[in-house]
Amino acid sequence: MNILDTLGNLVHQTAFFNLTIGNYIMIAVACVFLYLAIKKEYEPLLLVPIAFGMLLVNMYPAIMQEPVGDQAGGLLHYFYILDEYSILPSLIFMGVGAMTDFGPLIANPKSFLLGAAAQFGIYGAYFLAILMGFGGKAAAAISIIGGADGPTSIFLAGKLGQTDLLGPIAVAAYSYMSLVPIIQPPNMKLLTTKKERKIKMEQLRPVSKLEKILFPVIVTIVVVMILPTTAPLVGMLMLGNLFRESGVVKQLSETASNALMYIVVILLGTSVGAST
């Protein structure tokens, strides 16, 4: 009888006994994401940690549990706190800045308009969210998904106090970003002719080192003076770029664009996936 009781307790402690149909569906979704990331190589740096975080939390929900009394919270809960306080998105921007060459943008300022086109997606998502019954702040947080920008989506959701929506927004934004290689080609063919796709781009003018150094400094001053609340994201983006272009802090540039960037991607990806 003792052996049977022990076996019964063991069965009750397994994930199989405690999971709901919703958990099994999300486990299947996580496996699909892993397949797309590993087999199809669709944004594996994003999809692998997101999918694995999703897998873990749906088998063992306590891994995202908040601390209760003297009992510590789950591991991924502490990763997620870094999302809520906008620490990881800001560090991601610093890494992106350290990897980005703004030379083509400086040489051809008209290309700023390409980035402005993202606003159509943002406003479209905003009005769609309003029509679906979301409040103003919730719709504003959701709208950034339309710009396919994961770190900014997380940052704005936190700033607007929409922490209950932060997880779904982050998963939607990063899933959208990861699926761009699937979504983009058919849309490119739909919106352009074969002749337009064969247009040969002209060589842009050379950009001096002084221009590249001044660019992050000037952008930071102008943007933050106009919109002070953008300082965490714009400031970190331009700081990373200044590391790259100054040429005097090579170690910081390499760390921001490599080791630190990949550590942050792991923390951000697993915590975002676990928030589902």
State each model region's role.
Residues 164-182:
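Alpha-helical transmembrane segments
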Residues 85, 93-99, 114-124, 128, ...:
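Alpha-helical membrane segments and immediately flanking helix-loop junctions
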Residues 177-181, 188-244:
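Core mid-bundle transmembrane helix pairs that form the ion/substrate translocation pathway
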Residues 38-47, 66, 78-79, 99-114, ...:
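Interfacial helix-loop-helix linkers and transmembrane-helix boundary segments
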Residues 1-71:
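N-terminal alpha-helical transmembrane segments of multi-pass membrane transport
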Residues 56, 82-106, 240-243, 261-276:
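Hydrophobic transmembrane alpha-helices of secondary-active transporters
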Residues 1-18, 24, 186-215, 248-254:
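Intrinsically disordered, low-complexity non-transmembrane regions of multi-pass membrane transporters
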Residues 220-276:
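Transmembrane helical segments that form the transport core of multi-pass membrane transport proteins
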